[in-house]
Swiss-Prot record:
Gene3D superfamilies registered for this protein in UniProt: HUPs (3.40.50.620)
Organism this protein belongs to: Shewanella sp. (strain ANA-3)
Name of the protein this chain belongs to: 7-cyano-7-deazaguanine synthase
Entry superkingdom: Bacteria
GO annotation terms (biological process): queuosine biosynthetic process
Length: 239
């Protein structure tokens, strides 16, 4: 099944830069775009209200917020415990302390169930392997494994689309600009781990990654846009 044959999709939507960019793109490609947001008691839970506001502003087909607070009880992380400071250093296992084990496994499973009930042919998620935070559940191999599990477990054709998988952060900004939504993504999304909308706190790892990508794009617009066109045309990692 190809994305071209799909008319109805579910977007895993946090209200951050990546998922909002995916949502904006989806609105140009599909007849029905349904957003699903997860409340797991996250440190930056302001993102839920941001997602609600953006869903209304962008006039998506529907928006559902799901309570998954059980994840907060099971997964100890800087994103689920205010008492654990967000660190720029990796833990002993080589992962950031903001990694929430099982988060995307749970999110994609629930999004798959929702897609099944809606009759949607695809889930869209903004995970990325090229310029990312080091989370293992953002990798291409993980997504393909989850897609296979959902298809087999529900006996339904279902695709997981990852528009940003092989894009770096500068190219992700370029993608928002391509749809004339750079200002909306810059000023009205929430990526910051400390819950500050727009440019954020400027200190956490998420803000650093976002800022570096924006600066790169603004300083090299033509070059980055050309590289975006090449990356989206091939759908493969760029050398």
């Amino acid at each position: 099944m190809s994305a071209a044959s799909v008319s109805k999709v579910v977007v895993v939507f946090s209200g951050g830069q990546d998922s909002t960019t995916c949502l904006i793109q989806a609105l140009t490609q599909f007849d029905e775009v349904h957003g699903i947001t997860f409340d797991y008691g996250q440190r930056h839970r302001e993102e839920i209200e941001v997602a609600k506001s953006l869903a209304k502003r962008l006039k998506i087909t529907s928006h559902k917020v799901i309570d998954v607070s059980l994840l907060n009880e099971l997964a100890i992380s800087a994103l689920t415990r205010d008492a654990i400071p967000v660190s720029h250093e990796l833990m002993e296992n080589g992962l950031p302390n903001t990694f929430v084990p099982g988060r995307n496994i749970l999110f994609l499973t629930l999004a798959g169930i929702y897609a099944y009930q809606l009759g949607a042919g695809a889930i869209i998620t903004g995970v990325c392997e090229t310029d990312f935070s080091g989370y293992p559940d953002c990798r291409h191999d993980f997504v393909r494994a989850m897609e296979s599990a959902l298809v087999q477990g529900m006996d339904k054709k279902l695709e997981i689309i990852t528009p940003l998988m092989w894009l770096n952060k500068a190219q992700t900004w370029a993608l928002a600009d391509k749809y004339q939504q750079l200002d909306l993504v810059r000023h009205h999304t929430l990526t910051c781990y400390n819950g500050i909308v727009g440019d954020g706190c400027g200190a956490c790892p998420a803000c650093h990654l976002r800022k570096r990508g924006l600066e790169d794009y603004l300083q090299n617009k033509a070059e980055v846009m050309a590289s975006l066109d090449k990356a989206t045309a091939t759908g493969k990692p760029q050398a």
